[in-house]
Swiss-Prot record:
Heme b binds at H64, H93. It comes from Pan paniscus. It comes from the Eukaryota. Gene3D superfamilies: Globins. This is Hemoglobin subunit gamma-1. The modification Phosphothreonine is found at T13. CDD domains: Hb-beta-like (cd08925). The gene is HBG1.
Length: 147
């Protein structure tokens, strides 16, 4: 799963306190759908996903992106039990939605990119390392039902 040092936890929590969940969530999910278009098949009910501008302006993409990052915020409070924290979401995405678990890894990487854009110089290599460790652990926790 990945062991988080106290420094990792402090770094993740500190930056998370400055994240605008609505903006970053919409941008993260939107970028995932644009950069990895095959992920769009899980979002048929979202309406127009025909172009980058349609995706980035789609209110359903923004709303679901906010929901995803809100869930991530809950996980940040439970870094030592990500598998337990995401047990129900893992089951939902595996058994009911049949989401390819690789998509969780891709979404995490896109989130790291979005945070780097939003926080610029504040998003140091050390901050990136802690966040990368976290999104990798979250992807693993969300994929746990698949194994």
């Amino acid at each position: 799963m990945g062991h988080f040092t106290e420094e990792d936890k402090a770094t993740i929590t500190s930056l998370w306190g400055k994240v605008n969940v609505e903006d970053a969530g919409g941008e993260t999910l939107g970028r995932l759908l644009v950069v990895y278009p095959w992920t769009q098949r899980f979002f048929d009910s979202f309406g127009n996903l025909s172009s980058a501008s349609a995706i980035m302006g789609n209110p359903k993409v923004k709303a679901h992106g906010k929901k995803v990052l809100t869930s991530l915020g809950d996980a940040i409070k439970h870094l030592d039990d990500l598998k337990g924290t995401f047990a129900q979401l893992s089951e939902l995405h595996c058994d009911k939605l049949h989401v390819d678990p690789e998509n969780f890894r891709l979404l995490g990487n896109v989130l790291v990119t979005v945070l780097a854009i939003h926080f610029g110089k504040e998003f140091t290599p050390e901050v990136q390392a802690s966040w990368q460790k976290m999104v990798t652990a979250v992807a693993s926790a969300l994929s746990s039902r698949y194994h």
